[in-house]
Amino acid sequence: MYKISELIKGELCFFPELGYGFYPVPPDRPYDENYFEKYQKLADTEMGREITQSRMDLVNRHYSGELCDVGIGCGQFVESMGCYGYDVNSSGIEWLKKRNKYRDIYRAPVGALSFWDVLEHIDEPEKAVAMAKEWVFVSIPFFESAEHITGSRHFRKDEHIHYWTHEGFIRWFSLNGFSCEEFNDAESEIGREGIRTYAFRRVRNANQITTS
């Protein structure tokens, strides 16, 4: 006998009514020096520079103040924007500390946080966005169904834990106290596949949020 409760521990679960999917990524993840170097190569291209500029433009349309980029990739956005950064990759942490740009977002709230292709990697994303006092900026793959997820290049069993539909993502942020002020497909138009970018503004404090 094979229990459903055991099956779902190793497979994608998708909840259409929530617009949300979950994959149990193992704790041993590939965030090391090679990972950092891979993103250095991706950033040092015309497309990489266009994407960074698009992200800067999004932030600047809505916010001016203290910003921390969570999951810095190779640091291109941090360097271009002149903001702080947070990472779990030792290479990223070292890069930030050398430039006096490291900020542990879980120690104290920050005016705004950015998560460029990052939120889907975080085990408890609600704890991360809770540390934003005013704004959260995100780029993330979006999906329509479980079949869309499993057929996508963004279905990464060693990295991506969370999978949202567009509606599910906005709903999830609303439940966490944020209003969607803008979304666009600029990164997909530049050449990426199935990526949407969002600007969320805090409208309720964490202690005002209920689960009812």
Regions found by a protein language model. Give the residues of each.
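Residues lining the SAM
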Residues: 116-119, 139
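Conserved N-terminal segment of class I S-adenosyl-L-methionine
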Residues: 1-112, 116, 126-131, 149, ...
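Helix-to-beta-strand junctions that scaffold the AdoMet/dcAdoMet cofactor pocket
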Residues: 122-123
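Conserved beta-strand signature within the Rossmann-like core of class I S-adenosyl-L-methionine
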Residues: 134-145
